[in-house]
Curated annotation (Swiss-Prot):
Biased composition regions of type Low complexity, renumbered to the chain: 506-520, 528-542, 600-625, 636-645, 658-698, 924-937
Record key words, sorted: Apoptosis, Chaperone, Chromosome, Coiled coil, Cytoplasm, Nucleus
Function: Transcription regulator. Acts as a histone chaperone that facilitates deposition of histone H3.3. Has a role in chromatin remodeling together with asf1 and XNP. Has role in the transcriptional apoptotic response to oxidative and UV stress.
Cellular component per GO, a single term: cytosol
One MF term in the entry's GO annotations: transcription coregulator activity
Species in which this protein is naturally found: Drosophila melanogaster (Fruit fly)
Coiled coil: 438-469
Gene assigned in the entry: Daxx
Keyword Cell inner membrane: no
Pfam families named among the record's database cross-references: DAXX_hist_bd (PF20920)
Region of interest (Necessary for interaction with His3.3A and His3.3B), residue spans: 870-1659
Xref: PANTHER family: DAXX-LIKE PROTEIN (PTHR12766:SF10), DEATH DOMAIN-ASSOCIATED PROTEIN 6 DAXX (PTHR12766)
Example GO biological process: determination of adult lifespan
Protein name, per record: Daxx-like protein
Record text on subunit structure and interactions: Interacts with p53 (via C-terminus). Interacts (via C-terminus) with His3.3A and His3.3B. Interacts with asf1.
Length: 1659
């Protein structure tokens, strides 16, 4: 996967920084023992751990030599990204072919004062001149799953003015031209095979933490002369005996810093020479071997150490360890343990022990190659024994030789060690290693087992002592003896830690103690035998063991190369160290491994010392001058770094079997585990120990090379020690990752290795496994900070040409040479060390730590699916050349970081340089996907000095973050020389809605198989504020397929969210074997808790991103979901959609789980679906029943809504026919559910098949006795109700015999009554309402009038009476309200209001009754079809009935109007009508009389006929026409229309009228109206108020439409008929009277109109 680079820009002060933070910023070197974060950047000290592993006690290398307190460094689970921190990813160029992510953190001191960091430095990005071109690698090949992080002093990254010497694979030293910028490649083993391994290994991301210039200056000053001399000599490839281990270490440190590639190459050559070890070449990379080889001719050293490591070392060391080593190592182990205890660092102790071994093996130690071989041989024997023990023994063996060597040398101390080392040559080591055979190693290992047990106690004591002594040793380089004491104390403390771990790993500890004891007894013998045994074991055996160890763990891999190197110098040293470690324990072995590869360990220690302080540089020069001095320095370095070195070694050993033991010492649990692993892998452990030793040797060699390369001892060698301490923050117990362990074992050498070339895990095993996360352990290995970093050989530079992670580069934007460390005399104290870290993924399964080439763009890390959403591209830095700036006087600001200028996120405006001080990360929800892209920025890079300060701050922050990164180790990163760098600004966010993002996802899905194949990788994703503009240039997407999170990860759609979220958030995702682990950490909100107080944190895998989100309600049942789908299909309107998403969903989840899962409810849903299908137009009606049922259940919220849905088969649905009764009688068959707090749910499901109901209990949990009894009663009632329901159904179908006193009808009523009682009881037990299902029992709420008091009174009256109210009741209520509330309503107004209220309340009650009736009837009819739909005759009859319905409505309306009239008004109307009729009758009579008179006169027949016709006309005229209309005003102002009803036919007889009257009389006071009547009323007879008093218009009244067609006949009884004109729709205009012609013929008989038509309509 493409590696990401984190640039941490720690502005001096930001608004967010508290005084405490400012103090930490001002005094970063201030001792932070409680928190164990001394070396971390001040801003990052608050970052909580990432639970990468148990916190390791790391010796913090301070600028001052007095800094001895161990710092417990625990990787941060969550990385707190302070303001100004940007995270970027590099393309192919950024990452080495090994696939390591380059993470560079560089801090440069712009100010001479220590408070320079506090100054507000604009986070302007500086284009760092690096030859590297920043480009995202497009290769899809996934780098190794593990990311190795090694700390590298930023100054080392810089090119030193003098020519760097490059070691050719053939152990040739090739001087690099000054003009060429030096890239720091991972340290290659003395044999070139390591370089090959580098290609395999992912490039380690080097986190460089430059120490304050003052400390660096001191270290450089002390170590400078010696390191320069030795560097040049060693670089020259001279196999000069190192005057002292200190010199070797110094030289190695110098070489490591300036010539890290050379040391890497040397180590690689050594590895190649080691033969089978080339894969394990990291073992030969052990610092001690390179150191000796460097002091000795480096050329032979690569060859010899590699060969002896591969051959004689495995054999000889094992033999001596098996035989003489156990004997000698016992005393030496004790002595060594004591000096190791005295010596803070194991490496120091080892050197010291080697010096005593020099005493014991004075001749051998004098020829470093020979004596070390001899000494290491016995340790190898012990190592072999420990190798037999594998995990524990390997560690113990290494520690035992360290103890043996350290004890005797501790007594003799640096002088003897130096002498012995000088005496001991590669030849001696090789010879002894050759002499030592596997048998001897095994014997020694067996002896070591016994010794280990004894040594447990000694080691525990010594570890305690070591802890104290290590700190003491850190102080003075010149005091070898006190340092020896310190290492002893440290060893004691470490031994105690180891013993604790060893106690945990009983076998490993016993084995370790035994080898230590045997080694103590046979210190020299073991040393000799072990080399011999190792030689006997043969390089292949050691290689095999290293391979096995590599397979077993990174520690073994690392130990194997170390063993290979130790076969030459490393084996003797390892043996001597192992002999020393028998007493000191595995810590001493590790320290001895550091010491054993005297040069490597010295290099480590010198690197650590360089990292720690100039004092360590001085120690290294002293070691160069005196092996004893170098050992003292190593011891002091180890003491200073006892936490750093020993913890690192212990961490590495914990990772490796020996590293596990060291970690066990550091972390008793881890150490014990590591020791147990070592016990399991004793042979492998020997190989691992040898690897550790060889790695320290390789590291030492690399360190010496670097020291030689670093004649500028002033360079931040000591500041790198702080880096080491930072690197060692926590050793993780991952022996599985040999790469990580190897890289971690030697902070200096691994850094050099990482810088010089791909670091082999065996070389780094000495580093603590702090950063190594289980399979993705990260260790910050610190390369010696060589300010005078000579131009690293192009080879070295080439492997690490990949620019550091863009984010590191961005914030380090300081050009590599931008900040040259001023001469130590001139440099002000560095407030914060500047470090460059390169994160290189390390393969989890690979035993040899070979950084994989990061294929940035194309490679999709397995974690990418979750984390690769945000990707930032590094800026290409072309402004400065790494080679141009001399690194002697200035800290290297991080070769990787400087390689690329800081990358600015869109979160900060590109034009605002100060924006970097603000947090650039956003706290985005876990569902947020961010895809950064690069766009050229117009803003110039920030000034160099500010960039340097920013880099320092960023370096610290990034280092801490890297520590928190799982599966990442820190390795040095080389910067490719470039005259100028282009800044690229990433555009951060792509929304899922964007087409580009969709294409991106498709591409990622295509590459998903590649990710699955790749091992777990660590991805650092910067969650940036989403930019408003889409990304312009998008390189090949790195984001993995959106696996599970694909659906859950959602981009932040709104800019408001992005603006609101200003806190940085880091998403750390690790993918292991296809398992996605995603963690989103809000770094600001996480409290700063000391690691000791923090509980172990783990990253629980999030198998489904949805699970991480808040719990959601269970899905709908299948029936209910089908119902919702059907509703959407039937009605696709938005209203239905709102209903489905609203009430239907809310009510469902608010109802009890027992109810929604019950058979009754599911049956109800099924029936509703059937009805909706048959009557789709009534979909809302049918849904209402379901909603009412759910709503009724919502009343009681007894049960939680989140429910688990059992399979549908669990609650079989009976056919709908089994539910014949309405809801009032048959309650839904639902399982009883009892969910007590904290208890499981009890569900009782009932099957409806038989009369005997079966009850199914689901997840029955422990419930109280009371609940069980209640539950049992409920189930009993349900059974009874079910049986009664069946009986009711049978009785309804039975014939009724009215003569039978106990007829089926009576039985039916009794059963129904009993069913209702049972249902009410069930409701009581379940706490539900008894009447929730009866519409009639629901209260009404009248709100239609404008008077609230009246509304409430009327509603209360109706609900209380449970009867249809009367109009007068309504009117009385209104009158009462008017009187009480003084509404001031007139009588007519009250009548109108009461009338309206009466009608509306009546309709409400009527609708309720209809619904209830419909529910009851439909229960019987079920889903039957309407017979009228298939029978046309029935349909016609129904229509005719509807017509008659209109007539009935008219009658009702007529009498309703008449009811409104007073009796007086009615009487007056009648009188007036009579008078009118009388007048009319008189007129008619007069006409008739005139005609009669005419009859008396003679006339013709024609005239007679005319007269008869006239008389007939007069007689029928008044009745037929009814034209005489008079207007009369009633007292109440109503207009009465009096018309002669002559149109009534004979059909309207008294019988018909009687029938109508009888029909009307049948209505009771409650005014019940049938359903059909009320419906017709609502349609045909709209109600209107009476005519206003002012209206006086003539209205012609017509009785009915039919009147015109009927003969005009008055009613026989002359009875008034009051008809409603409105209902008849027969109003005519007054002018119609003109058209009617009155009959002129008078009628002798007056006709009285018998109908008065009163119209209330307005004309």
């Amino acid at each position: 996967m493409s590696a990401s680079v984190i640039c941490v820009d720690l502005s001096s002060e930001s608004d967010e920084e508290s005084p405490a933070k400012r103090r930490r910023l001002e005094d970063p070197l201030r001792l932070l023992t409680p928190s164990g974060r001394q070396s971390f950047p001040a801003k990052l000290l608050n970052i909580p751990k990432a639970s990468l592993g148990s916190a390791m006690v790391v010796p913090v290398a301070e600028t001052g030599p007095a800094r001895e307190t161990p710092v417990i460094v625990d990787p941060l689970r969550s990385m707190h990204i302070p303001s100004g921190i940007t995270i970027t990813k590099h393309q192919k160029n950024v990452l080495a072919t090994n696939g390591n992510m380059n993470l560079s953190l560089a801090e440069s001191n712009n100010n001479n004062n220590t408070t320079s960091l506090n100054k507000n430095v604009t986070p302007k990005q500086i284009n760092v001149g690096t030859g590297q071109k920043v480009a995202w690698s497009v290769s899809s090949k996934a780098p190794s799953p593990n990311a190795v992080i090694t700390t590298v002093p930023s100054h080392q990254v810089r090119v030193t003015p003098f020519n760097p010497i490059r070691l050719a694979p053939g152990s040739k030293i090739i001087p690099a031209s000054n003009a060429m910028p030096a890239k720091i490649q991972p340290i290659l083993g003395m044999g070139q095979p390591q370089q090959q391994a580098q290609a395999q290994q992912p490039k380690a991301i080097i986190v460089g933490f430059p120490k304050p210039n003052t400390a660096v200056a001191q270290m450089a000053q002390h170590q400078k002369p010696l390191t320069l001399q030795i560097h040049q000599k060693l670089i020259a490839g001279q196999q000069q005996h190192i005057a002292s281990i200190s010199q070797l270490q110094q030289v190695s440190l110098q070489q490591q810093q300036p010539l890290r590639p050379v040391s890497i190459q040397l180590q690689q050559q050594q590895n190649q020479r080691n033969g089978s070890l080339p894969g394990k070449q990291q073992k030969p990379l052990e610092c001690p071997v390179p150191a000796q080889q460097e002091k000795l001719p480096r050329g032979p050293l690569p060859t010899k150490p590699a060969e002896p490591l591969s051959g004689p070392l495995p054999t000889e060391p094992d033999e001596p360890l098996g035989g003489p080593l156990p004997t000698r190592p016992k005393p030496p182990v004790r002595s060594l343990q004591q000096p190791v205890n005295k010596n803070t660092a194991i490496g120091v102790q080892i050197q010291q022990s080697q010096e005593p071994l020099g005493g014991t093996l004075p001749t051998r130690q004098k020829p470093l190659g020979g004596q070390l071989l001899t000494q290491q041989k016995p340790p190898v024997g012990s190592i072999q024994q420990s190798v037999k023990q594998n995990t524990g023994i390997g560690v113990q063996i290494q520690q035992i030789p360290k103890v043996v060597v350290g004890q005797q040398p501790q007594k003799v101390y640096l002088n003897k060690l130096q002498q012995e080392q000088q005496k001991i040559f590669l030849g001696h080591l090789q010879q002894q290693q050759q002499k030592t055979f596997l048998g001897q190693l095994q014997q020694e290992q067996q002896k070591i087992l016994g010794q280990l047990q004894q040594q447990k106690q000694q080691q525990q004591q010594q570890q305690k002592k070591i802890l104290g002594q290590s700190q003491q040793q850190k102080v003075p380089l010149g005091q070898p003896q006190p340092q020896q004491k310190l290492p002893q104390q440290l060893n004691n403390s470490l031994v105690q830690l180891q013993q604790q771990h060893q106690q945990r790993t009983s076998v490993g500890q016993l084995q370790q103690q035994q080898p230590h004891q045997s080694q103590q007894k046979n210190s020299m013998v073991h040393v000799k035998q072990q080399p011999q045994q190792q030689k006997k074991i043969s390089v292949g055996q050691f290689q095999q063991q290293p391979q096995q160890q590599q397979k077993t763990s990174v520690a073994q891999l690392q130990q194997q190369p170390q063993q290979q190197q130790k076969i030459s110098v490393g084996q003797l040293q390892q043996q001597s160290q192992q002999q020393q470690k028998p007493s000191v324990g595995q810590l001493q072995q590790q320290s001895q491994q550091q010491q054993t590869p005297l040069v490597g360990q010295l290099q480590r220690q010198t690197q650590q010392q360089q990292k720690t302080s100039a004092g360590q540089f001085q120690q290294q020069p002293q070691q160069q001058q005196k092996i004893s001095a170098g050992q003292l320095q190593e011891h002091s370095q180890q003491q200073q770094k006892t936490l750093a070195g020993q913890l690192q070694q212990q961490a590495q050993q914990q990772l490796n079997t020996s590293a596990g033991q060291l970690q066990q010492q550091q972390k008793p649990p881890k150490a014990s585990l590591a020791q147990q692993a070592a016990a399991q892998k004793q042979g492998a452990g020997l190989g691992q120990q040898q690897q550790f030793q060889s790695q320290p040797q390789q590291r030492t060699s690399a360190g010496l090379l670097q020291q030689q390369q670093m004649p500028q001892k002033k360079i931040v060698m000591q500041p790198q020690l702080p880096k080491t301490s930072v690197v060692l923050p926590r050793p993780q117990q991952l022996p599985k990752n040999p790469l990580l362990v190897a890289q971690q074992q030697s902070p200096k050498t691994p850094l050099v290795n990482s810088v010089m070339g791909p670091q082999f895990p065996s070389q780094q095993p000495s580093l603590p496994v702090v950063n190594q996360i289980t399979h993705k352990s990260m260790t910050i290995q610190r390369l010696p900070m060589l300010q005078t970093v000579q131009k690293i050989l192009p080879k070295q530079i080439a492997p690490q040409q990949t620019p550091p992670p863009a984010h590191i580069v961005q914030k380090q934007t300081m050009p590599n040479a931008a900040m040259q460390n001023p001469p130590f005399a001139h440099r002000p104290p560095i407030v914060r060390p500047m470090t460059v870290a390169k994160i290189s993924p390390v393969p989890t399964n690979n035993k040899v730590c070979i950084p994989m080439k990061p294929q940035m763009a194309s490679y999709v890390s397995p974690t990418d699916p979750t984390m690769t959403a945000a990707r930032t591209l590094p800026f290409r830095s072309s402004q400065r050349k790494t080679s141009e700036a001399p690194m002697t006087s200035t800290h290297v600001q991080g070769f990787t970081a400087s390689a690329t200028p800081p990358q600015r996120l869109l979160a900060t405006p590109p034009h605002c340089a100060a924006a970097l001080n603000e947090p650039l990360l956003l706290n985005l929800p876990p569902t947020t996907s961010i895809t950064p892209q690069l766009t050229p920025t117009t803003t110039p890079p920030p000034a160099g000095p500010s960039a340097a300060v920013q880099q320092q701050q960023l370096a610290k922050a990034a280092a801490i973050k890297l520590n928190s990164l799982p599966e990442a180790s820190i390795s040095p990163v080389n910067r490719s020389p470039t005259a100028s760098a282009k800044r690229i600004q990433p555009i951060t966010v792509l929304k899922k809605s964007d087409e580009e993002w969709q294409r991106h996802l498709e591409q990622q899905q295509q590459k998903k198989h590649v990710q699955l194949q790749s091992s777990s990788m660590t991805t650092i994703v910067l969650v940036e504020s989403p930019p408003t503009t889409p990304p312009t240039d998008k390189p090949e997407p790195e984001r993995g397929p959106m696996t599970v999170e694909k659906s859950s990860i959602k981009p932040m759609a709104t800019d408001k969210q992005s603006r609101a979220i200003k806190r940085p958030a880091v998403m750390i995702s690790t993918k292991k074997s296809g398992l996605v682990v995603t963690e989103i950490v809000d770094l600001d909100e996480i409290p700063d808790i000391p690691p000791e107080k923090r509980g172990k944190e783990c990253f629980p895998p999030i198998k489904n991103a949805a699970k991480a989100a808040p719990s959601v309600n269970a899905p709908f049942t299948t029936e209910y979901a089908a119902l919702l789908r059907l509703c959407r299909e039937v009605d696709k309107s938005t209203h239905m959609e709102r209903l489905v998403k609203g009430e239907l969903t809310q009510y469902y989840y608010s109802a009890p789980e027992s109810f929604v899962m019950s058979c009754g409810f599911r049956n109800l849903v099924t029936m509703a679906m059937a009805r909706i299908r048959s009557e789709s137009y009534l979909v809302y009606v049918h849904l209402k029943y379901v909603l009412d049922e759910l709503a009724s259940r919502r009343l009681t919220k007894m049960f939680p809504t989140v429910r688990a849905i059992p399979p549908a088969s669990q609650f079989p649905l009976p056919p709908a026919s089994q539910f014949p009764l309405p809801p009032t009688l048959t309650t839904p068959k639902q399982p009883a559910i009892v969910k007590a707090p904290g208890q499981q749910t009890v569900m009782a499901g009932r099957e409806q098949d038989d009369e005997v109901e079966e009850v199914t209990l689901v997840n029955v949990g422990t419930v109280s006795c009371e609940e069980r009894r209640r539950d049992e009663r409920i189930r009993h009632f349900y059974r009874t109700l079910h049986a009664i329901t069946k009986r009711i159904k049978m009785l309804e179908e039975a014939e009724v015999d009215l003569n039978d006193e106990d007829s089926s009808y009576l039985q039916l009523e009794r059963f129904k009554k009993r069913a209702c009682q049972i249902y009410e009881k069930i409701c009581d037990l379940k706490g539900e309402s008894k009447s929730v299902r009866r519409q009639l029992k629901k209260p009404i709420h009248f709100k239609d009038s404008d008077y609230p008091h009246f509304n409430n009174s009327l509603s209360a009256f109706v609900n209380r009476m449970q009867d249809f109210p009367d109009y007068h009741d309504v009117l009385q209520i209104l009158e009462k309200c008017n009187k009480e509330k003084e509404l001031g309503l007139a009588k007519y107004e009250m009548k109108r209001i009461a009338y309206d209220a009466f009608n509306k309340v009546g309709r409400m009650l009527q609708s309720r009754r209809k619904n209830d009736l419909y529910e009851t009837v439909t229960h019987y009819t079920a889903n039957g079809k309407d017979p009228a739909s298939s029978d046309p005759e029935l349909l016609a009859k129904l229509k005719e009935n509807n017509k008659k319905q209109t007539k009935i409505s008219d009658i009702l309306e007529k009498y309703a109007l008449e009811q409104d009239l007073n009796a007086e008004e009615r009487q007056e109307a009648r009188l007036k009508e009579k008078k009118l009729k009388q007048v009319k009758a008189d007129e008619e009579a007069a006409k008739l009389a005139a005609l009669a008179e005419d009859d008396d006169k003679p006339c013709t027949s024609a005239q007679a006929a005319a007269k008869a016709a006239a008389l007939a006309a007069l007689k029928r005229g008044p009745a037929a026409r009814g034209n005489v209309i008079r207007k009369k005003r009633a007292a109440n102002g109503r207009i009465f229309k009096i018309a002669d009803d002559g149109d009534d036919s004979e059909e309207e007889s008294d019988s018909e009228d009687d029938d109508v009257e009888e029909f009307v009389n049948n209505f009771q006071a409650n005014s019940d109206v049938s359903d059909a009547d009320s419906e017709v009323e609502a349609v045909t007879s709209p109600k209107r108020d009476a005519l206003p008093l002012a209206e006086e218009e003539d209205v012609i009244d017509i009785t009915r439409d039919e009147t015109g067609k009927k003969n005009d006949e008055g009613t026989p009884n002359g009875r008034l008929k009051i008809m409603s004109v409105s209902s008849l729709n027969a109003n005519f205009v007054h002018g119609q009277d003109l058209h009617r012609k009155p009959n002129p013929m008078p009628s002798a008989k007056p006709v009285i109109a018998d109908q008065i038509i009163i119209s209330d309509e307005e004309s």
